[in-house]
Amino acid sequence: MTKKLFLFSLLCIFSIISTFSFMINSKQKGSAEKIIPATSTQYNNKWLTHRLIKMDYDNGTAFSVIQKAWNNTEHFILSAREKCQSATTTLDFLYCTNALLGDMFPYKESNMVSPAYASQFSDCDLNVYLLIDAAKESGRQIEIIFAPFHAFISYIDDNNVRAYWETTANNNKGTVADLNDNHWYQKTFNKFYYVPRSENYIESLYPVLIANSVDSAHKKEIYNNLKPEIKKTPLAYDLYYSMKNEISSQDAEQINLLLREDITSSDKQLLLTGYFIKNGNTE
């Protein structure tokens, strides 16, 4: 394949991915159906959402936003425990809690948890964080699975079979996941995706997810403090190369190799396309 054809292929793939992103964004809904009352909720270290919110605070988010986010997440978690306690299976529990989530937190994309939870909206991965806490509060365990541009739930059902739940369907009220749906569950060769992950893993990965929402100094600090296993994820590679002032020929070769597995990465595709254009190397 010539470089010109390769460049054209990258642009076509990026166009397709941009279309997927637009379709995801089009799910955004209006205001929440249930307004959460304001209280002076305290930080609760046992909840994943509260720990992630605190990480936002450590990265410069205003405390007024942090306080409201803590309040709203606690209200949801305790409401879910009260209203969904009669659920006899994890599936029933997810139907109940996700419906409640959709009422309190309509769908809207956000990299950081705090501004989203504080303003009563949520997206795919933020939904999972809320439901992990609600499940744990009710003595159940669920996990997150990352897909390209998406995240959903995995759990072991009452028959000891792994099952999957899509949190964003039905106006953010959820339904059983159909992994054959290529719109949500895009195919990729990278082994980071489609593996159940624990809340500890989420905490380790979260700084990468918010890196584009902080200043450049914090971004470098975030990358330098990542655990070695997280630095090997496709998202961390995107972060690493995005911080470089200039992509070298060696960088371009490495990005090209990474794209063989991480075929859905629009960041890597754009970096490589930019490199070829800048160097006038399209033949």
Model segments located where?
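Hydrophobic membrane-targeting alpha-helices
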Residues: 17-21
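Intrinsically disordered, low-complexity segments enriched in glycine/proline and serine/threonine
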Residues: 6-7, 142
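Bacterial N-terminal signal peptides
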Residues: 9-16
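A structural boundary/capping signal
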Residues: 22-283
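Positively charged n-region of N-terminal signal peptides that target proteins for export
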Residues: 1-5
